[in-house]
Design a protein with these regions (language model features):
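Outer-membrane beta-barrel signature, preferentially recognizing the C-terminal barrel domain
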Residues: 292-320, 356-358, 411-417, 457-474, ...
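A beta-strand signature from Gram-negative outer-membrane beta-barrel systems
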Residues: 162-212, 224, 581-585
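Transmembrane beta-barrel wall of Gram-negative outer-membrane proteins
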Residues: 219-246, 251-286, 301-326, 333, ...
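Gram-negative outer-membrane beta-barrel transporters
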Residues: 429-435, 444, 536-539, 557-645, ...
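Signature of Gram-negative outer-membrane beta-barrel scaffolds
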Residues: 377-476
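Extracytoplasmic beta-strand/coil segments of soluble accessory domains associated
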Residues: 106, 110-146, 150
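Short acidic/polar hinge/loop motifs at secondary-structure boundaries
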Residues: 128, 147-176, 193, 263
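Short, acidic, small-residue-rich periplasmic hinge/interaction motif at the N-terminus
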Residues: 49-98, 106, 136
Length: 706
């Protein structure tokens, strides 16, 4: 599908052998379509002759890059391949991840031009992730298409139960995406897709097993251990991984411990491909010294978070690919625990200690219909959020309070929300065009239950409509031009509504944020090069931020700060300079990636604002350069250089990372360095980042087939 066609040939449908002397001449200059082959003919055909064989070598630099044109990406409600998608979805591949100096998912996202990663701690501890000048509460995080975002606060959205070794690819959808993924995708979405192999169509019951073990250690007493295994047996696939990381931290009061476990399973009917089940279960926990994470006045903060997630989904295919219906029901569950101490080891509400328990139970259904006029999709996603807390929500009757293990304190406050997302979308697929139009009808019900002051239910109801239109034009298979307009609405988080302490004050009367975004982008792609340019304009109303209203303010207040317009442009390029590492000269560049983004912001408000904590501290400039080099034989070197300038008083900085890697068939050894120049820099407020951080380790792989 990647070859260009200049002279369209006439087609001849082959059904059987005529055994005539002139038959072969009828085929000259014509495209022959094989309509029927007998069983005896197929039995004499070798697999090597009818399929493309891909040889996997030990060094990832020696593997030819697989084009992603036919990978289904999250750019629309209906399942569309990247080539047909009406938008450009940035995809970070497994090869990109393996070469990067990355210890966490957050480190990988730093290399994406349109993504802003504001790090408080190392190895993905407490990281704010945003897209296109937005804030950390304005994106949706998905794991294999399941929403794992935290509606309490986006600060904890990066508590992933997976490691970089578990990931097949990461999809980044920039811009307002509510009509595709729900109201939380206010400014974009990130979908993490994990590794998993499905049983072959032959239905062989021969078990297959592949496993890995990883150990690494380095600066500041950092130690990581992890393992994973993938088992195929009959119609079932199973992937299980786990890991543990600990460190003394690179700065004062930044020590941490992290643990995770993840399982993903699947079942399909092999030959028929009519039905498939996917199920996953994951858990992560981390405890860390929070330094000055939330207030520069307190440098001895502490936090512990826990995340449990589970989902079960099915895919039912009825009819044919051209004229058929695909049904996708799913249920999912997320549980979050958050224990925060303003002063480490100091307990009690008066000392700023709080506990939060959050449960999210949801169900979704999507129907994709392929018919004469295109691909239509209708669906719904309904979820119930319930938070019990010592600080968030309304006071509850004492007999309903929840016990907290290990302390005499109890969860005495509660709030719950029911989120209903109703979707409709239609896609028109033409030879050179894809036109996708859709809308989201969102209903939010906030219920504070029977409060302690009155035996009544405090109830708030809002509903909004978010339409959108995406158009792509493909003049050739190398070019793609996209134009889109989408609206989105986001409800405040529980932190926005209810926080009340010596450093912050929320506001229960906050209005939902509104956003309207226009975007135009272009992609040029060949086997050796890829170039992307895009520009966007977003118009936001009732935007939420934490601010000092006057110079005398001592607490940040959650506030609707008025209108906020973001205008930006980004450029990305990737050049494959040399395909075969075996024939390359020592230190010869193999792949070069270059990215740059620029954002200008315009703010209008009637509210007095002295200082902004998040929304006005956007990245104006971001430049990324990545270089992969072949050194000798199985030895390779990868560099990453990043320069960025943040507004609202931050100094611009350069950061250089590197990874030296030796890779054999079953063993990988590496040495990686973060912040090689030991540059002093800040991503958030007064939270100082570590200097030079060196890690060394290895990954051992086992592959068995019985």
């Amino acid at each position: 599908m990647n070859k260009k066609s200049f002279n369209k040939r006439s087609r001849l449908l082959f059904k059987h052998f005529t055994r005539k002397n002139y038959a072969l001449f009828n085929c000259l200059g014509r495209e022959v379509l094989i309509g029927m082959l007998s069983v005896s003919t197929l039995s004499n055909a070798k697999a090597n002759g009818i399929c493309v064989k891909t040889e996997l070598t030990g060094d990832s630099l020696q593997r030819k890059e697989v084009r992603l044109d036919e990978v289904i990406v999250s750019g629309s409600r209906a399942p569309l391949a990247a080539l047909q998608s009406p938008v450009i979805v940035e995809v970070i591949t497994r090869e990109d991840i393996q070469r990067a100096e990355a210890s966490s998912v957050n480190d990988i996202l730093k290399l994406a031009t349109g993504v802003d990663v504001r790090q408080r701690g190392g190895f993905g501890v407490q990281t704010d992730i945003s897209i296109n000048g937005g804030t950390f509460d304005q994106i949706t995080i998905l794991l294999n298409g399941t929403n794992i975002s935290n509606p309490q606060t986006g600060h904890n959205a990066s508590d992933f139960p997976v490691s970089v070794n578990d990931i097949e690819r990461i999809e980044i959808l920039e811009g307002a995406s509510s009509r595709i993924l729900g109201n939380a995708a206010f400014n974009g979405a990130i979908n993490i897709v994990t590794k998993q192999s499905y049983p072959s169509a032959s239905g062989s019951s021969t078990p297959q097993l592949s496993s890995y073990i990883e150990l690494e250690g380095g600066s500041y007493g950092t130690l990581t251990a992890g393992a994973g295994t993938n088992v195929l047996a009959g119609n079932f696939s199973n992937y299980l991984s786990g890991g543990y990381t600990r460190s003394d931290g690179g700065t004062e009061n930044s020590d941490f411990e992290k643990g995770r476990i993840f399982y993903k399973g699947g079942w399909n009917d092999n030959r028929q491909n009519r039905f498939r089940l996917d199920y996953q279960l994951g858990a992560s926990t981390q405890s860390y010294g929070a330094n000055t994470f939330y207030s520069a006045k307190y440098n001895n903060q502490y936090e512990k978070t826990e995340h449990l997630m589970a989902s079960l989904g099915g895919t039912v295919n009825l009819g044919t690919d051209d004229r058929g219906i695909q049904l996708k029901p799913a249920i999912y569950y997320n549980h979050f625990n958050d224990h925060y101490q303003l002063i480490r080891h100091e307990e009690g509400a008066a000392k700023g200690e709080n506990y939060h328990w959050l449960d999210i139970l949801g169900a979704s259904f999507n129907a994709n219909i392929n018919w004469l006029m295109g691909k239509s999709s209708i669906g719904a996603d309904i979820s119930k959020e319930t938070i019990w807390s010592t600080a968030y929500g309304a006071d509850q009757p004492e007999e309903t309070w929840k016990e907290i293990k290990g302390t005499e304190r109890r969860l005495s406050r509660k709030a719950s929300r029911t989120n209903t997302n109703l979707f409709a979308e239609h896609n028109i697929l033409l030879r050179h065009w894809t036109i996708s139009a859709g809308l989201l009808y969102y209903i939010n019900n906030l219920d504070e239950g029977k409060t302690a002051e009155k035996a009544a239910v405090t109830h708030h109801h809002t509903s909004t409509l978010s339409p959108g239109l995406d158009i792509s034009y493909r003049p050739t298979q190398s070019w793609k031009i996209c134009l889109s307009w989408n609206k989105a609405v986001r409800t405040p988080t529980y932190t926005d509504l209810y926080t009340s302490n010596v450093a912050q004050q929320g506001d229960p009367s906050l209005k939902p944020e509104e956003n309207s975004m226009f975007k135009i982008s272009a992609l040029y792609k060949t086997n050796r090069a890829e170039f992307t340019v895009s520009s966007f304009y977003s118009h936001g109303r009732n935007m939420i931020d934490w601010v000092y209203e006057t110079e005398e303010s001592r607490r940040y207040h959650a506030l609707n700060i008025g209108k906020l317009d973001n205008m930006g442009v980004s450029l990305n390029s990737k050049l494959q300079l040399h395909e075969d590492a075996k024939s390359a000269f020592p230190f010869q560049p193999m792949t070069v990636r270059l990215g740059y983004s620029y954002i200008h912001q315009s703010h209008k408000t009637d509210q007095p604002i002295y200082r902004s904590l998040y929304a006005l501290e956007y990245l104006r400039h971001k430049l990324t350069v990545q270089l992969d080099q072949h050194i000798w034989n199985r030895l390779s070197l990868s560099w990453s250089v990043r320069w960025q300038q943040r507004m609202n008083g931050f100094h611009p900085y350069w950061k250089i990372d590197g990874k030296l890697q030796w890779k054999a068939e079953n063993l990988t050894l590496y040495l990686k360095g973060d912040n090689l120049t030991a540059h002093r820099y800040y991503d958030i407020g007064a939270v100082k980042q570590p200097g030079l951080w060196i890690m060394a380790g290895g990954i051992f792989q086992i592959r068995l087939k019985r």
